[in-house]
UniProtKB/Swiss-Prot annotation:
Keywords recorded for this protein, A-Z: Cytoplasm, DNA recombination
The protein's name: Recombination-associated protein RdgC
Lineage of source species: Bacteria, Pseudomonadati, Pseudomonadota, Gammaproteobacteria, Alteromonadales
Family that this chain belongs to: Belongs to the RdgC family.
PANTHER family noted in UniProt: RECOMBINATION-ASSOCIATED PROTEIN RDGC (PTHR38103:SF1)
Length: 303
């Protein structure tokens, strides 16, 4: 349940959640496994997995949702080889070249034949809906997968007035200033990893890992015009992460000490522990996002 990445959206119109109403809306779009002829299926599943019973898990005004995706694994090379064999056989038999339309029809026929025998894989993606700060946090490093979940949520509830989070000042400008000065805002501590890019196509990219970022070797790249597009940071004593210039927060890792705060609950009641961990995680993520927004100079005015 502990989030590992954050793609952040903000509401550009006031948004509130009624848990019972949202639960009913999601029920119409619940996940069901692929049938023999389905290439993929995507739908909402239990927010707390096998330990929960509902599609939304709520604590205060924080709401967790989860979606499951099943995809058939049908390698393109397998289809290509089967198609080439079929086309070759028919062209030899009929002594003519098949048209593109005929080849496309054969490809569809081959795909339909192979689908029932294809293996499938499942993945899950979670999101935290936070009306108290008017944001949604998606646990994904992929913008495309995050958008897919938001599209499903929008379809379920009818409207979802969100935009990707953006800031008044370009993030790379702030990150570059922090690295250049060797100083971050009080809530954060710089770690030993960064990626710098040049504005020009010829300037290239340089990455540093497990290195003192205050060294002249690093700062020299800023002097020649490169800007910091990724920077590893630590938030207080709780979360390590990498902040990117596209506002994505990746490789989110909660410290063992922080995660141990609920150890006194034990594991006799898994749902009680999950509920406590959810409250702990969501509170700290809200604190992290608020601190990031403050450190970067505030959000860009919504349109």
């Amino acid at each position: 349940m502990w989030f590992k990445n954050l793609t952040v959206y903000r509401f550009n119109k006031p948004f509130s959640v009624d848990p019972d109403s949202l639960e009913k809306s999601l029920e119409d779009f619940t996940f069901s496994p692929c049938s023999s002829q389905d290439i993929s299926k995507f739908g909402f599943s239990k927010a707390m997995g096998k330990h929960g019973e509902t599609l939304i898990h709520t604590a205060g005004d924080r709401h967790l949702i989860c979606a499951t995706k099943e995809e058939k694994i049908l390698p393109s090379q397998v289809i290509k080889e089967a198609l080439e064999e079929k086309v070759g056989h028919l062209e030899a038999e009929e002594n003519r070249k098949l048209t593109k339309k005929e080849k496309d029809a054969l490809k569809d026929e081959i795909t339909t034949t192979l689908l029932p025998r294809a293996f499938s894989r499942r993945s899950q993606i979670r999101a935290l809906i936070l009306p108290e700060i008017q944001m949604i946090l998606v646990d994904s490093s992929s913008a495309a997968k995050s958008e897919e979940l938001m599209a499903l949520l929008r379809k379920a509830i009818g409207t979802l007035p969100i935009i990707p989070i953006s800031f008044k000042t370009p993030i790379e400008t702030q990150l570059t200033e922090w690295l250049k000065e060797g100083k971050t805002p009080p809530a954060f501590e710089m770690q030993d990893e960064a990626e710098l890019k040049s504005d020009s196509d010829e300037g290239g990219i340089v990455r540093f890992k497990q290195q003192d970022l205050s060294e002249n070797e690093v700062l020299a790249h800023i002097e020649v015009g490169k800007q910091v597009h990724k920077l590893a940071l630590h938030f207080g004593q709780s979360i390590a992460f990498v902040l990117q210039s596209d506002a994505a927060i990746k490789r989110l890792k909660f410290s063992e000490e922080f995660r141990a705060d609920n150890d006194d609950l034990g594991n006799d009641d898994p749902m009680a522990r999950l509920d406590a961990d959810f409250a702990l995680m969501s509170s700290e993520l809200i604190a992290l996002i608020n601190a990031v927004v403050d450190a970067l100079g505030g959000l860009e005015d919504s349109i």
